[in-house]
Amino acid sequence: MNSVERRAIAALSSVLGLRMFGLFLILPVLALYAGEIDGATPAMIGVALGMYGLTQALFQVPFGLLSDRFGRKPLLVAGLLLFALGSVIAARAHSIEVVILGRALQGSGAIASVVLALLADLTREEQRTKAVALVGSSIGFSFLLALMLGPILDAVIGLSGIFWSTGLLALMALPVVVWFVPAVERPSRRGDVQPAWGQVRRVLQNRQLLFMDCGILVLHMVLMAFFVAVPFALLETLELPRDRHWQVYVPVLGAAVLAMVPMLILSMVREHTFPVLRAGVAILLIASLVLLISDRNTGGLVVGLWLFFVAFTLLEALMPSLMSRLVPAQSKGTALGVYNTFQFLGVFIGGALGGWLFGHFGGSGVFIFSAVAVLVWLILVVAVPAPKLLESRTVDLENAEERDFSALVAQFRGLPGVHEVILLPGENIAYLKVDPERFHNESLSKMAGIELQ
């Protein structure tokens, strides 16, 4: 990576990481305030937990499109200011309705799509996958850190203080955007990172992609439903006051990451990727069942939580990588945009439905719902044949001697391991989907003037 790419990745990882850290901080504590906020019922608490997912799903594509017109940095600044405003409103709230409004504003500053677009502007194709992975890892780290620190901060500054802190974090990210994120004079639209409305229908008709979309929806639906019920389980089963919940989250999350890493490494071997996915979903089902039968059972609750976090951290890391290897070369941005939309919808559905179930049926209702949803997912994972995992290559046609594009397509298709060819003559780019076991970059040297980006 060159200096501009390293600077861009560091700055954008910090910006997105700070924002997501602020969103995740309240997950382990908000449900415990059901008796202290005016109008708060379990159902309304669930809506407050998940509301940011609904507005994020609605605004992520518009934010990306607006950044094409008005520039990346102005939209990043606008998104962070919306997040800070939502945090202030939630911090000053005395009723659950105002908390929900604040959470909605937090989610409406949907800068993730803008960050991806800016990464496309500032990184070369051969570095882009690594760049996206590094930015994604900052979100994963933010999630783990927030679950550990949320209960500790709650004990010190309370829920209002946490919301004030999240607003401050958003404002701290503003100087990073203004002074450290490299400037882009002419934002580009790249099909490998940005959505296109015309491709949405085609992506939704792809069964393999729809299967992954539904999977990420279930995963985040279960996550949010759990955080309606689990804090009360810690109170009642472990008889642990909320200012000591960190004593469970910290060791359980640490042990879960240690158990997850070997499985994630194993998944990097092509023939093991899909079996590891199936194992992760199976562990998630077992976790739901263990938590269901662990009423008043301290050991069962801790084991169930550990299994849940093993499964969640594994699937959260594995699924985006698997998704990127399944999507059509020219539709990667659209496919990942749809995938993220399903994820955010899962956040909202899980929070709202989990809260309603907890209010009517208690924790058992939440865990039964989660187990049924994951069981359906597991049946699909086992029943669906493992797909052939391909990789993307982007080819620069600027200096190609052959200008007959139909002839170029025929030449590309004649190379060993090439499964799909999409030419964009206006951009002098070709997208290839290749079998990495059969395709070798050196084979392009036979085509005059052709080189990988």
Regions found by a protein language model. Name each.
Residues L168-P187, W377-P385:
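C-terminal membrane-cytosol helix-exit motif in multi-pass small-molecule transporters
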Residues P28-P42, V228-R244:
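Short amphipathic helix-loop junctions that connect adjacent transmembrane helices
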Residues G53-V61, F143-L144, L253-V261, V347-F348:
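Residue-level signature of mid-helix packing/kink "hotspots" within the transmembrane helices
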Residues Q60-G71, A259-T273, F358:
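Helix-to-loop junctions at the C-terminal end of transmembrane segments
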Residues G102-I139:
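Cytoplasmic helix-loop-helix junction between adjacent transmembrane helices
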